[in-house]
Regions:
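Catalytic-site microenvironment of enzymes
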Residues: 2-313
Length: 313
């Protein structure tokens, strides 16, 4: 009986060992088959491209160079011929001093000399602009004081300012003034200025008062300007006018826009948007007092208008 039980136990143990071995072999074969038929895919990390510039032109930092033009200057009667020539004035076929209102269409360097331009001129005006037409007495000094104040405020805001004149002993032509929109006044190069601000004061018989801007109106056809040149020029002029009205004692003249002088040489030749400001009426006693006492405030208004424009365009 004992022997029989012992045999049974041995058989059970042997059976268990056989079952274990068979199971191990089957599992090993299955594992080997799965391993040999499978692949492991590794997705590599993207390699960064060093130095690639994905920014488009509009996203790049725009110029912070502002050209400020204090209108008028030294009376032409006090200028020698050499001085006129060095200041950008030219002589026409009659030997008279002045400058041409336009460039040849599409140019930024070739004066029209009466043809090859869009021909836009003021009422009773012409392509030729005599030097004496720009002579002023009181206004020149008012303009440069307001312009210098604007320069100080703009520089404090981080802008680079180029002045078209720095004293009342200078009277560059408009063409020469606009050359400051270019690096080193080199008009064969691309303009590097952002904006051109022309600062003037008005006169109208002593009754009118206030600040306004002269608006541009298409068509203009000089080189470098964009399709929205007039629109941008008018937005710039409007912003400066509103800021001066807001912080100074000057009020707005009319609705703040003077619409009847879009043929100004500045508009016809500037390569960049141009704000053309008429700040107060110097022949009105109340405005004249403000113009003599609030230059710093007026300059701040101009600077704030420029800064607002640059931050929104």
């Amino acid at each position: 009986m004992t022997k029989k039980i012992t045999k049974i136990i041995i058989l059970v143990i042997l059976s268990a060992v056989i079952i274990f071995e068979v199971g191990y072999i089957i599992n090993r074969n299955i594992l080997n088959d799965n391993t040999s038929n499978s692949t492991i895919e590794i997705t590599p990390e993207p390699i960064p491209v060093v130095g690639r510039d994905d920014e488009n032109d509009d996203a790049k930092e725009k110029s912070k160079i502002i050209v400020i033009d204090p209108g008028h200057g030294k009376p032409s009667s006090l200028m020698s011929d050499e001085e006129k020539q060095s200041s950008g004035w030219v002589q026409n076929s009659d030997g008279d001093w002045g400058e041409w209102r336009h460039y040849k269409s599409g140019s930024a360097t070739e004066n029209c000399e009466g043809s090859g331009c869009n021909g836009r001129v003021p009422t009773n005006g012409a392509c030729w602009y005599p030097i004496a037409n720009g002579d002023r007495s009181k206004e020149s000094d008012i303009n440069i004081r307001n312009a210098m104040a604007a320069k100080r405020h703009l520089e404090a805001m981080g802008y680079t300012v180029r002045m078209t004149r720095n004293s009342n002993n200078e009277n560059p032509s408009i063409t020469k003034r606009l050359s400051y929109c270019y690096p080193n006044n080199d008009m064969t190069k691309s303009p590097d200025a952002r904006l051109f601000i022309s600062i003037h004061s008005n006169a109208s018989g002593g009754e009118s008062r206030g600040v306004a801007y002269i608006s541009a109106k298409d068509p203009y056809d000089q080189a470098w300007i964009t399709a929205d040149y007039s629109k941008l020029s008018n937005e710039l002029g409007s912003l400066c006018t509103k800021q001066i009205d807001e912080i100074s004692s000057l009020s707005i003249y009319g609705n703040g826009e003077i619409t009847w002088e879009p043929e100004l040489i500045t508009f016809c030749k500037s390569p960049v948007p141009c704000g053309y400001l008429e700040i107060g009426f110097f022949d009105n006693s109340s405005d004249f007092a403000i113009l003599n006492s609030e230059n710093e405030i007026i300059g701040e208004g101009v600077a704030k208008g420029v800064d607002e424009f640059c931050k929104t365009h």
